[in-house]
Amino acid sequence: LMCIRVSPKWGLWTFGLEVERVRYEATQSGIGPRMHQLRNLYKDKRIIVGCDKLDVVRGVIQKLQAFYELLLHYPRWRNNVVLIQITIPAMHSSPKLERQVSELVSLINGDFGSLSFTPVQHYHQLIEREEYYALLSVADLALVTSVRDGMNTMSMEYVVCQNEHGQSPIIISEFTGTAVHLQAAIQINPWDIGGVAAAIHHSLCISDQERYDRNKQCHEQVVSKTSHTWALSLVQQLQHRLRHRFSAHSTPIFNLEPMLKGL
């Protein structure tokens, strides 16, 4: 339309994490005391962590449904596991979604809780960075159940924190861009509620060796594809295309006028 001749080319460059920044923030002096507080607060409990925007595509509903199924069909985890779910207010709030989440939290706590223990700790708010990194570091499992998502930075931050502290596994939805990035994570279909519950049970029961192997592979992927390597690879590709453009030889447009005159 603009009479510009182009040779378009597309590519896939996986966006990464600022690993050194996360590692630095996760090892600050204030993190240790927060971790100690969490361990004392949930002594003898396995901690599952979730941190999502309160948005339909983030799968918070599916996560809570799967946690209910876990406690229903795997009774060994009743009074032995806690889900700490942070839901960050979205830009456009949804009263209906907020109500659904609150109802599910109340259902789980009503059916499986007691006067001395509440299985779902739900915080609909932003939390301080120290609390956030302490939670990622002390958790026994991270749970990402998005039904559609791009690069989920929380999952990568969890991998970095766990490499420094616990080497605990992560469950991640196959419908996130991060699933391609973290091949060694335990991947699930968030719509398969029973399957997610089974994956949670498996993740809480895996051997120390499997925990170590999965975390090691995930950590290698995270540190090898950082935001810096993403920017570098993109710039290198642009430079390559520019060099190719200036060295290319274009075929001139065929001139029909001399041919027509000879007819």
Model-based region annotation:
Residues H36-R39, Y133, H219:
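Short hydrophobic/charged patches on amphipathic alpha-helices used for structural packing
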Residues T87-E130:
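Nucleotide-activated donor-binding/catalytic signature segment of Leloir-type glycosyltransferases, i.e.
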